[in-house]
Regions:
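Active-site loop/oxyanion-hole signature of alpha/beta-hydrolase fold enzymes
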Residues: 2-9, 13-15, 43, 48, ...
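Proline/glycine-enriched tight loop/beta-turn segments at coil->beta junctions
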Residues: 17-25, 51
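Structural cue for short, hydrophobic secondary-structure segments
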Residues: 28-31, 55
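Serine-hydrolase catalytic-loop signature spanning alpha/beta hydrolases and amidase-signature enzymes
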Residues: 33-41, 53
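Conserved catalytic-core motifs of eukaryotic protein kinase domains, centered on the activation segment
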Residues: 38-40, 64-69, 128-131
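Flexible "cap/lid" loop of the alpha/beta hydrolase fold
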Residues: 104, 108-109, 113-137
């Protein structure tokens, strides 16, 4: 789905299902230079198991507009604002690669949103991919 947020359109994959009132949310976070497509099979599985899925393309990634964010902190803050705009109160967060760092930063900066964390192929530090920043200039 396209969600207008902070003057850009954000692409949010939902696993092929509309959100249902009262269902738990699962937020899938892609890595640097990636998109919601990272989570195609997983998002559909959880959606068909009854979860509300949010797999956003970060600004400047995939099908989302805008310019790439330049820090993990900015990504977590942006994500918290997006979730607030969508009316999400808590969620399980699943991150891959740089998405792990965003999930961890969410737990640190915006812990009220974080019910569970699943971190796949993360690292202690992953810089924002410079070609993304350069490409948006």
């Amino acid at each position: 789905m396209k969600f207008e947020f902070e003057q850009i359109f954000v692409h949010i994959a939902t696993g092929g299902r509309a959100h249902k009132d009262g269902a738990d949310f699962v937020v899938f976070l892609h890595g640097s230079g990636q998109s919601h497509l990272t989570w195609g099979l997983q998002s559909r599985y959880f959606a068909y198991e009854g979860y509300n899925i949010i797999a956003p393309d970060f600004p400047g990634h995939g099908l989302s507009g805008g310019v790439p964010l330049t820090s993990i902190e900015d990504m977590a803050d942006w994500l918290a604002r997006l979730l607030a705009a969508m009316g999400v109160q808590t969620a399980a967060f699943i991150g891959h690669s740089q998405g792990c760092l965003v999930a961890l930063e969410m737990a640190s900066r915006h812990s009220a949103y974080v019910d569970k964390l699943c971190l796949i192929a993360g690292a202690a530090a992953i810089p924002v991919n410079e070609w993304l920043v350069d490409a948006s200039a």
